[in-house]
Amino acid sequence: EGAPVAAFYKALKTAMKHWRLDELTGDLPETWQSFSDRVLAARNHIQKEYSDKDRVLIVSSGGAMAMFLKHALNAADDTVVELNLQIRNSSVTHGFFNNKVVRMASFNNVPHLDRPDRFEAITYF
């Protein structure tokens, strides 16, 4: 069974805070800043290579999507942690973009699971 859900989320939030503040030690695969830069570079690539007439599908993890949204919304780093904890597996987030801006239209939708016989399939990790 493992730890209670609340304890898991608290530990995850604490770990992400320490990662964000560059307080983790050891051989980390990526710093918070490198992760942020990588996601921003992907967003910039999409805005440069595609026009507002194109449809672009982005498939990603919740963490990368939360960071993408942070950049799109010009939000604080704390927002990434909060968004990441809310993102449901297989959710759909919809936005519009051009070469200057990304605008979010919807976030974290699960229309394919949003019915009584599929509610148990909604998961977060």
What does each of the following model-derived ranges do?
Residues 1-6, 33, 48, 52-55, ...:
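Acidic, low-complexity terminal tails and accessory targeting/binding regions
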Residues 40-48:
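Generic structural signal for well-ordered alpha-helical scaffold segments
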